[in-house]
Curated annotation (Swiss-Prot):
Signal peptide: none annotated. This is Peptidyl-tRNA hydrolase. InterPro entries: Pept_tRNA_hydro (IPR001328), Pept_tRNA_hydro_CS (IPR018171), Pept_tRNA_hydro_sf (IPR036416). It is an enzyme of class 3 (hydrolase). The lineage of its organism: Bacteria, Bacillati, Bacillota, Bacilli, Bacillales. GO terms for cellular component: cytoplasm.
C-alpha cells in the first residue's frame, strides 16, 4: 500500500497559507476522485482508497505542523506501510513559487514537520515532494510568511503547482520507477 502525506496546520485560519500547501495537494486529489478523509486515528485524518487498482493511504496530520510525525508514524505502523511506499508533500522556502522538487530521500532541510516525521520513522530515506513557496521579502519573518495566505496573483501560479504536484503523486502511485517520475515532474511549473 502506498502512503501519501500532505503537511499543514489544522484549522480554518491556516487554509490557503504557504505552510498548508501539502494539505492543498491532498485535498485536490481527494476531490478529483470523490474521496474524503473520513477516518481519524493516531492524531491523523485519513482514508484508504483504491486508485488505479492500487490501495492508497492518504493522511493529513491533525497535529500542528511541528508534530506531524505523531500522526504519520503510528498510522504507517498500524497499516504496515513500508517506508519506501511513503511520499510526503510540504512547503519549501528554498524553492521559488512555481517550482517543485521530487526527491528519493534527504534531510529535513530546516522544515519542522519533516524533522518530526524523520524522528518518528527513524529514517530520512523516504520520498518527498518539496513545493516552492519562496522566501519572504520586505523584512517579514519566516513564521509570519509561511502562515500568510497566498495572494490572488500567487494563487494563479499555485493552482497550477497544486495540480502538477497531484499528477506527480498519481504517477508515483502508478509507477515502480520513481526516478522516471522525478524526471517528468521536477522543475518549474508553467
Amino acid at each position: 500500500m502506498k502512503c501519501i502525506v500532505g503537511l499543514g496546520n489544522i484549522g480554518k485560519r491556516f487554509e490557503l497559507t504557504r505552510h498548508n500547501i501539502g494539505f492543498e495537494v491532498i485535498d485536490y486529489i481527494l476531490k478529483k476522485h470523490n474521496f474524503s478523509l473520513d477516518k481519524q486515528k493516531f492524531k491523523g485524518a485519513y482514508t484508504i482508497e483504491r486508485l488505479n487498482g492500487d490501495k492508497v493511504l492518504f493522511i493529513e496530520p491533525m497535529t500542528m505542523m511541528n508534530l506531524s510525525g505523531e500522526a504519520v508514524g503510528p498510522l504507517m505502523d498500524y497499516y504496515n506501510v513500508e517506508v519506501e511506499d511513503l511520499i510526503v508533500l510540504y512547503d519549501d522556502l528554498d524553492l521559488s513559487q512555481g517550482q517543485i522538487r521530487l526527491r528519493q530521500k534527504g534531510s529535513a532541510g530546516g522544515h519542522n514537520g519533516m524533522k518530526s516525521i524523520i524522528k518518528h520513522l527513524g529514517t530520512d530515506q523516504f520520498k518527498r515532494i518539496r513545493i516552492g513557496v519562496g522566501r519572504p521579502t520586505n523584512g517579514m519573518s519566516v513564521p509570519d510568511y509561511v502562515l500568510q495566505k497566498f495572494s490572488k496573483e500567487e494563487m494563479i501560479t499555485m493552482d497550477k503547482v497544486i495540480e502538477h504536484s497531484a499528477h506527480a503523486v498519481e504517477a508515483f502511485i502508478e509507477s515502480s520507477r520513481f526516478d522516471h517520475v522525478m524526471n517528468q515532474y521536477n522543475g518549474e511549473v508553467n
